[in-house]
Amino acid sequence: MKAVYFICNNHEWGHVSWRVWDILAEEGFLAESAGFLFCGQDVKRYSDGAHEYFFVPTDLALCLDYPRFLPGMLEHFADADMSGMVTWHEGGNAPDNVLTVHSLGDMASGNYGLANPRYMRNLLLAFERNREELGLDAYHVTTEATHWSGVHDGHGDPSLLVQFPVPMVDIEVGSAPESWDDDTACRALARTLIHVFDDDGKTVHNLLCVGGVHFEPNFAEAALTSWGDEAYGVTHCLANQWLVSGEYENEDGFRKACACVDSIAGGIEAIVMHDKTKGCYKDLARRLGAHYDVPVYKHQRLRSPETMEFRKSK
């Protein structure tokens, strides 16, 4: 299996990512050159004997100059099994001391990056193990609403996101400067990257999550939940704020929501909607359930997984 991570190693730009790059170098993961350049910088390769990992240095966050980076991504990494961008999280109302992994998509346009629930779950579980091992008791591991920073300040082409044929996630530390500068938190992130293919063998039931807030605790908890030999697979989460701004109550909203479902590897087995979601978006969830022939549940059912029926989407 092959994973690739895009990491800004420019100390003069941004947060978290260059610290992660330096930690990867310190711990010996960047000792081998991959033998080619990406936008003028030497790509690094690490193998654990079973899988290989490519670490790609960039001069700024990948999403902020996708037109420049995409040709190299397609040339060198179109055959990868999983990919990720290392960055930081910030926001006026964002929680602090978070270690996050989230799927990519532009809800306004309905362009969704490919998502792999099993690999994303592996990253979240590895992040949690590293959080515990490094004594990061003040932090918590979470996912968040699906979004993409490739559209910013009113500029950007979200259709570029779907041109990279590899599942991708953002992997972040947030959300305040004290967290960005926390070497231990960045070390937890760095060590997580080489465990994306570590698998506990559980049966993963893929969900589409509809509604809720950006850091929706019910969906975040589900992403780390397992029972017996089963677990939830959480990737795309369609936050309420962007359902509204994207006008998902309209016919075009159904098209965009279908594009979201179709981007999830293996399809979905259930739809979970936040109970406080407006009626028109609950109707959307039910329509999607009928279209894909999967059950639709309110978010409270996530607490009783043994009572849920799962059915692979058609």
Language-model region placement:
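N-terminal catalytic or cofactor-binding beta/alpha core of small enzyme domains
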Residues: 1-165, 176-177, 183-187, 194-219, ...
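Acidic, Ser/Thr-rich peripheral helices and adjacent loops at domain boundaries
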Residues: 223-241
